[in-house]
């Protein structure tokens, strides 16, 4: 009588497990196919078109001189003092708005997380409400509010807090306020979505062990909320560096997006505009990578403190 092979059932089980894993991978890839196709058509293909234009010679009749290859546009961008001053202003605006949006977003998200009932609904509604209006309308509304004879200056003068009107707009202060108003709701929602998954009893346990309120927030809440903080920082920074509406409506200073518009629509220098865009994209990716690393280290230091 033939002896049964004890390895045979195990081989069957192993094969079934492999087939199940492969089926799950294929299903996941199939579900991701529409998103991958969207990313390919909307981001990857346009980027390579942009890169091709940046490597071509300029043409007075066409977008670029077809069949030409040159690094002249990149040379012009890298040696232009005007371009680098615009880069510096755009990144400075992005850094200031990002710091303010993360700090204010963290406080506001924490307030929503700890509130209950009607107050919580009102706080959430006040975050979502600005998103129900168009970007241009809610940005342009800051002109009568922040003008030298606007509502804010009149209020400060009537309270005796200032002796003469403050020049908010046109100016960088007005741009920071307007851009902060644009990105703050997204920062709040990103941070709150993480805080909403936290267990408040962990914070209470830290306080029972002797941690003060500020220390329990810094060492328990902030490290746990760091994924939301990173998302808020990336959104705020990328949007603010490439901002167009707020700088255009509230300031006379030229930003990256405004300069690209001028090069394309007014000067018809598409290769130069494309090279400037590629350079800014690379600088933003490097900056976001540095910011991601720094925020992760800060979160780790708070957690280990």
Question: Where is each model-derived feature located?
Answer:
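C-terminal transmembrane helix and the adjacent membrane-cytosol boundary/short C-terminal tail
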Residues: 2-14, 192-207, 274-305
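Glycine/proline-centered hinge or cleavage motifs at structural transition points of membrane proteins
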Residues: 209-211, 223
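A short amphipathic helical element positioned immediately N-terminal to and/or at the very start
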Residues: 18, 69-78
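Membrane-water interface segments at the C-terminal ends of transmembrane alpha-helices
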Residues: 27-60, 75-77, 81-165, 169-196, ...
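Cytosolic juxtamembrane amphipathic/interface segments immediately preceding
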Residues: 15-29, 33
């Amino acid at each position: 009588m033939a002896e049964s092979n004890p390895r045979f059932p195990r081989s069957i089980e192993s094969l079934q497990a492999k087939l199940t894993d492969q089926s799950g991978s294929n299903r996941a890839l199939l579900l991701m196919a529409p998103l991958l196709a969207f990313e390919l058509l909307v981001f990857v293909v346009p980027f390579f078109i942009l890169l091709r234009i940046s490597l071509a010679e300029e043409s007075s009749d066409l977008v670029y001189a077809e069949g030409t290859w040159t690094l002249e546009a990149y040379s012009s961008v890298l040696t232009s003092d005007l371009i680098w001053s615009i880069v510096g202003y755009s990144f400075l605006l992005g850094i200031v708005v990002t710091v303010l949006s993360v700090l204010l977003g963290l406080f506001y998200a924490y307030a929503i997380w700890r509130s209950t009932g009607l107050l919580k609904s009102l706080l959430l509604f006040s975050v979502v409400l600005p998103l129900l209006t168009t970007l241009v309308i809610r940005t342009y509304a800051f002109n009568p509010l922040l003008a030298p004879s606007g509502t804010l200056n009149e209020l400060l003068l009537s309270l005796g807090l200032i002796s003469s009107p403050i020049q908010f707009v046109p100016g960088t202060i007005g741009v920071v306020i307007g851009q902060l108003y644009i990105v703050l709701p997204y920062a709040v929602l990103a941070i709150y979505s993480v805080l909403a998954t936290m267990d408040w009893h962990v914070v209470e346990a830290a306080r029972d062990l002797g941690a003060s309120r500020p220390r329990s927030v810094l060492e328990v809440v902030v490290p746990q909320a760091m994924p939301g903080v990173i998302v808020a920082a990336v959104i705020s920074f990328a949007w603010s560096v490439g901002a167009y509406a707020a700088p255009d409506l509230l300031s006379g200073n030229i930003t990256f997006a405004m300069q690209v518009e001028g090069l394309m629509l007014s000067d018809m220098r598409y290769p130069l505009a494309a090279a400037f865009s590629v350079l800014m994209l690379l600088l933003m990716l490097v900056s976001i990578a540095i910011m991601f690393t720094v925020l992760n280290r800060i979160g780790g230091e708070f957690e280990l403190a």
